[in-house]
Amino acid sequence: MKAKEFITEGLNHPIICVDVQPEYSGMNDGDENSVFPEIIDFVNKQTGPVLMFVNAEDQGLSGDSVQSIKQYWDDTICPEDERYTYNDETEDYDENPDCPKINWQRFTIVDKGYGYFRAWMDHGIEPATIIATIRELYQQKKSDSRELQFPASNQRTPQQSLIMGAMQEMEDDPISVNWTSVSQLKRFNGAYIVGGARDQCLREVELLMSAFNVKYKRIDRLVYT
């Protein structure tokens, strides 16, 4: 989606933001990807709700905590050396009223971890088969693809046969769908989606949304690889 296409939609549009955090920004290596500040600035200038997926310490999958991610966003919007000015009269530091702030009440932050579809994605299982498997998991009320049950081979639908083939091929790497709420995703139907990585965690979120016909608009210039 191009910038000019969302200008007319208003600032209150919902946003899904995936993995915009220090660990993936390059800042820890002294080489921050320029798209990260652009994403943060864009999200902060909007006024609608934000569903923010992160990989944080709750899942043990990155060196970031939710608090350090929020601090990274705050510092990006207004660096610490600009946030306060020294007051000679009080001999203390005053908060700069012109420094922009992030309204964290707009945000729902989900520490999702990662890798729930990645083995299948990286192995080259077709997206349509992954989506069909996700739908089957919810229909059977299962969270792990190894728990799926199907009728005998002569009674299966072609789609069920494709799922079974993928399950057998990926026997040691199941799909898991217990990492987020589908009802929560549905509340963000039509949302802008930003972040990344394009073919990794962001793509996992897109596949889950597609499985339940939840629409989204990817802003390509605000997606990192």
Locate predicted features:
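Active-site acidic carboxylates
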Residues: K2-D144, A152, E206-R218
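Short acidic/polar capping segments at secondary-structure boundaries
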Residues: P22, G115, A197-D199, L222-Y224
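Surface-exposed cleft-lining segments at the edges of enzyme active sites
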Residues: Y24-S34, S161-E171, F188-V194
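Amphipathic coiled-coil/heptad-repeat helices and related helical stalk/stem segments
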Residues: V35-I39, I175-S181, L202
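Catalytic cysteine-centered active loop of the rhodanese-like fold, especially the PTP/DSP P-loop
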Residues: D58, M164, L185-F212
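Alpha-helical scaffold elements lining the catalytic groove of polysaccharide deacetylases
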Residues: F117-R187
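A short glycine-rich beta-strand->turn/loop micro-motif centered on a GG-aromatic cluster
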Residues: Y192-G196, V214-T225
